[in-house]
Structures are given as C-alpha cells and as structure tokens.
C-alpha cells in the first residue's frame, strides 16, 4: 500500500516488499519508526556478509499487525532526525482506541505456482485480541501471526568484460585484422564500427532457487488511563523471519580465443550471439548453494503522556530494541559446493530470445548428464552475524496557544 503514495517506490526481494525508496533516496536514507521510536535494523544481504546499512527490512513485519503507516517526506520538529528521504512511522493497534472486547482470527492458504517440483499450499494464520476494563481505563491487547511461504525462481545471469571501443585491439576484444591468426575476424558478423562501444560476454549461467520463508510476529500491549489527563502504556514487540534458499547453478566461462559472434547496430552494440570452441579440457561449471539465515527483532518500551492545564502536553517515551541476524545452519550462513564436468567442445549464448539460451556441446565420452564425469572444483563456507541495538529515551512537549493573534 505504500507504493500508492506519490514519490514512494518499493524494492522487492523474492517478490515481497523489503525496503523503500522515497523521492529518489534509497533505503539507507529513510528513517523507519515503530510507534514513533527509531528501530534497529539488521540483515545479511547476499547471505555472505553483514552489510554496512541501516535500512529497515519491512519483510520482518506482517501487515496484519499494523494499524497504520505515516509517511513524512519533509522535516518536522516533533520527528527524529536522520531521514533525508523520509520518515516512516509504523503504528500498531492500541486497546483503548477501541474500547470493549474485540477479537479476530484469520486463516488462509497461499497457492504458489512458481514452485519447480510442486505447487504447495502454505498457511497464513493471524489473530488479534483486545479487551478493556474499569470503564475503559485499562486495556490489554495481543496480536500474533504466522506465515509460511514456499516459492521458486529461475534466473539467467551474464557477466561482461569492460566496455570496448570498436577501434581497440586488446585481449577479449573483437579482432581488427582480417588476417587474424585465430580466424575470428571472418566469424564476426556486423562487427561494431571503430567509434561504437560494445561489451563482450565473460560468463553466463542459469540459477534455480527454492525459497522457504517462515515469519512469526507478536505484540503485547498494556494501556492504563487512570485519569482523563494521564495515560501509561507498556508494549513488547517480537518478529522473526527465517529464510532458507537452495540454489542450483550451471554456467559457462569464455576464454575469448576461437570465437564466433553476431552484433547489433551501434553506437552501443550488443551481441546477438557469442560462441567459442575449445580444445579438450574446458569445463562446464556446476554449483549447489544453501543460504540459511534468521532475523529476530525485539522491542520493549513504555510511554507516559500527560495533558496538563492550559494546553500543555508532555510525553515521556523510552525503549530498548535489538535486531539480530545469524545463520540457522551449523555450517554457516552460506554454503557453496562447486563442481565441474571437463570436456566442453563448444558453447554458445543466444541473446535473441526472451530468455537467453545457453547451448553446450561436449567431446565424446564427456556427457554432461553422466554423474561419473563430475569432478570437485572447490567449496566455500561463509559465516556472517549482525546485531544492532538502540536504547532511547525521549521527552517531548507541546503547548496549544489560545490567543486571538495566533490562528
């Protein structure tokens, strides 16, 4: 729903809203508050390292536990500083806002057709329970939600060598000499002109990822209003977001030796296709990877509000909040096992289709579908941890003037 606001765009991760960009300023430049309090942020980014970022991940919070969102795109004296792009305040329910007994439970299933192996239905359960006592002077509220989602995604990736001018003659660039000893000049169709800019494919591959995400949210609120002018509130918020991502990758690398290619017209030219032939010994790269991480946010706070005589208002607020991201696997936050099948005779990437097509021809006896031909190529075990903590106490005041010269 934030995307409906002018100047606000959503950055998505695996199809779900994660961070926001406001007025062109990225997530690092937007300050996120929870009930007016600055929240810590943690995450493991690409699952291999803790990023140097304070951007808040909205994927940690379920929409069912949010009562409203305020977006401030300009500064105000009553708001914390630090939001260059915006200040976003997430508001959660309060029991005295709706006196009496209130309760709701929602159960639904999510049917995701993106799964490679099956199309499972995953559960989403949420509930809210609120009640007031003592003629509406004491209120207790509890919210909870559980969400599980399984999805898959397929992706094509390509790496490129730095941009070349059509007049360059360096390693990796297209040959200029018609008598090139490799014969690549004759196998280059519609070669870029000397003043054109182009890039050469360095590598290409397919990634197939299965995602399993579990999100748990909960909040407890105690609100007391002994008099019409005094209100006390204590709340505790908990969120947990666990993500497992299993990725299988297959790809090719180019040596830029015996190549054939076709190119689009300049001045910025790109390949229609790029292929290369090899002597025995070239490999087809295969990788299996697992990223398993969990982010946990905890916040406990209190708020005391007093409406004094003559329009005077004082608000004392404090909270202790932590955000922690760590691996759930005993082998670390990210594991990658690399292997190779040696015996690639030729390889080609065709960029003329909606999804670029990689084709590989193997030498006899080196079939890619024969597990006996797979050789280990290297493993990587990475471990990352991030923790952010905020202890904050604030005292705010206001005075409503009631004079004829102030409108």
Regions found by a protein language model. Give the residues of each.
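Surface-exposed beta-strand-turn/loop segments characteristic
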Residues: 43-49, 112-117, 137-214, 239-282, ...
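Short, solvent-exposed loop/turn and secondary-structure capping segments
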Residues: 32-34, 43-45, 81-83, 152-156, ...
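Outer-envelope beta-barrel architecture signal
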Residues: 30, 65, 99-103, 136-140, ...
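A beta-strand signature from Gram-negative outer-membrane beta-barrel systems
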Residues: 4, 17, 55-106, 153
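Periplasmic N-terminal accessory/gating domains of Gram-negative outer-membrane beta-barrel systems
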Residues: 1-28, 36-61, 70-76, 110
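Short strand-turn segments of transmembrane beta-barrel domains in outer membranes
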Residues: 70, 95-131, 142, 158, ...
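Outer-membrane beta-barrel transmembrane strands
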Residues: 86, 92, 109-110, 121-132, ...
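Surface-exposed, extracytoplasmic segments of Gram-negative outer-membrane nutrient-acquisition systems
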Residues: 324-371
